[in-house]
């Protein structure tokens, strides 16, 4: 399974083509749009999300509510394009018109793709870089992940996410599955412990008032994953390696870990390895889950726990020092409309990116042309965990 996105932040639309979804999977566009709506929420978002009403139009690959097995094309319209039609349109415009609209960017933002992207593609107007490097593209990735979540639900695989930390204020590292699920989306910072939600909001407000931004840590959990998905044989088939690549490909994500993650470096092996147990109902299972459901690059049947680190957004309303690429003079960096904190929304993006990586790995492990075939293979693998 693979996908390709296209579109710019202030262009007319985002388009995504997904190839490899099995036939006969029931798809309701409202289920996808429900996930799209979640991405737009969260405390700390900027004015852009007040303009956009992200909904998906499916234009190929689904007929009368069921997938055909052919490529699925989805479109997300950018409502803000109305204000950018001339500057972002395909038709040529004069340099005078461009200057009059004050949309040319020559002062790159530290921490963004602006300067290096301009060098790489020889763009003297850095808007050509930031329009594509913008996190607006993640709307298309959430649409892909939403499709994958529908597939995973048919296989009795649950995936959900939360915020663990914002600006140094932390929720508990781990919760039991029941507590986690019962408290999803109960507040606008997406933490389980309501008592720290206001402290996080205050931290976000403080950053906004200072013209600054803050980052944090998100967590994604995948439950009821069959054993043995991934491989120990080759580096590029390891499931944790694939998930890690997907997570750090999200805008502003700078780190990823599994289970206890970097804390594993502080403990002896006897406190980190998960002991193997067996009973006739569950088959093999682990007495703990310090490793986050992954051993030797493969799923071991325990919940897969993924932690992603998001740096503060690089666009600041109190901009840092930069250099004008035309005059080489010192200037403050360009200011673009942005969020002061996008960690709650990023947890949704991360959830859907992980959903894609999980679905892709499953479809490689259990090659199937239609959903019924895939379901049967999953049943057989789960039975193997009991009978082996």
From Swiss-Prot:
GO terms for biological process: amino acid biosynthetic process; aromatic amino acid family biosynthetic process; chorismate biosynthetic process. Keywords: Amino-acid biosynthesis, Aromatic amino acid biosynthesis, FAD, Flavoprotein, FMN, Lyase, NADP. One of its GO terms (molecular function) is FMN binding. Its EC number is 4.2.3.5. Gene3D superfamilies: Chorismate synthase AroC. FMN binds at residues 132-134, 251-252, 296, 311-315, 337. It catalyses: 5-O-(1-carboxyvinyl)-3-phosphoshikimate = chorismate + phosphate. NADP(+) binds at residues 39, 45. Reduced FMN (FMNH(2)). InterPro entries: Chorismate_synth, Chorismate_synth_AroC_sf, Chorismate_synthase_CS. GO terms for cellular component: cytosol. Its cofactor is FMNH2. Pathway: Metabolic intermediate biosynthesis; chorismate biosynthesis; chorismate from D-erythrose 4-phosphate and phosphoenolpyruvate: step 7/7. The keyword Zinc does not apply. PANTHER family: CHORISMATE SYNTHASE (PTHR21085:SF0). Homotetramer. This reaction introduces a second double bond into the aromatic ring system. NCBIfam families: aroC, PRK05382.1. Belongs to the chorismate synthase family. This is Chorismate synthase. It comes from Staphylococcus aureus (strain MSSA476).
């Amino acid at each position: 399974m693979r996908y390709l996105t296209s579109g710019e932040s202030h262009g007319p639309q985002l388009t995504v083509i997904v190839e490899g979804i099995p036939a006969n999977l029931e798809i309701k566009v409202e289920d996808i749009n429900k996930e799209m709506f979640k991405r737009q929420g969260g405390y700390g978002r900027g004015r852009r999300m007040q303009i956009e009403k992200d909904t998906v139009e499916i234009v190929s690959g689904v007929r009368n509510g069921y997938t055909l097995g052919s490529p699925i094309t989805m479109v997300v319209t950018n409502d803000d394009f109305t204000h950018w039609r001339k500057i972002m349109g395909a038709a040529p415009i004069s340099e005078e018109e461009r200057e009059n609209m004050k949309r040319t960017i020559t002062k790159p933002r530290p921490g963004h793709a602006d300067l290096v992207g301009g060098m790489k593609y020889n763009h003297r107007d850095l808007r050509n870089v930031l329009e594509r490097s913008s996190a607006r593209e993640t709307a298309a990735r959430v649409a892909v992940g939403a499709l994958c979540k529908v597939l995973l639900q048919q296989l009795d695989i649950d995936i959900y996410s939360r915020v663990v930390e914002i600006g140094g204020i932390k929720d508990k590292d781990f919760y039991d599955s029941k507590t986690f699920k019962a408290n999803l989306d109960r507040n606008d910072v997406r933490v389980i412990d309501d008592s720290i939600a206001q402290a996080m909001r205050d931290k976000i407000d403080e950053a906004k008032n200072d013209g600054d931004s803050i980052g944090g840590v998100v967590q994604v959990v995948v439950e009821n994953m069959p054993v043995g998905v991934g491989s120990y044989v080759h580096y590029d088939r390891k499931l944790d390696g694939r998930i890690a690549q997907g997570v750090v490909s999200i805008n502003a994500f700078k780190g990823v870990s599994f289970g206890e993650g970097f804390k594993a470096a502080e403990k002896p092996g006897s406190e980190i390895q998960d002991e193997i147990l067996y009973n006739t109902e569950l088959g093999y299972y682990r007495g703990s889950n310090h490793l986050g459901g992954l051993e030797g690059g493969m799923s071991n049947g325990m919940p897969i726990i993924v932690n992603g680190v998001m740096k503060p957004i690089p666009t600041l309303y109190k901009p840092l020092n930069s250099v004008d690429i035309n005059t080489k003079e010192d200037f403050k960096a360009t200011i673009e409309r942005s969020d002061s904190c996008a960690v709650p929304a990023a947890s949704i993006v991360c959830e859907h990116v992980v959903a894609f990586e999980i679905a892709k790995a499953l479809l490689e492990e259990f090659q199937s042309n239609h959903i019924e075939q895939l379901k049967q293979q999953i049943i057989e693998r789960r039975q193997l965990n009991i009978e082996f």
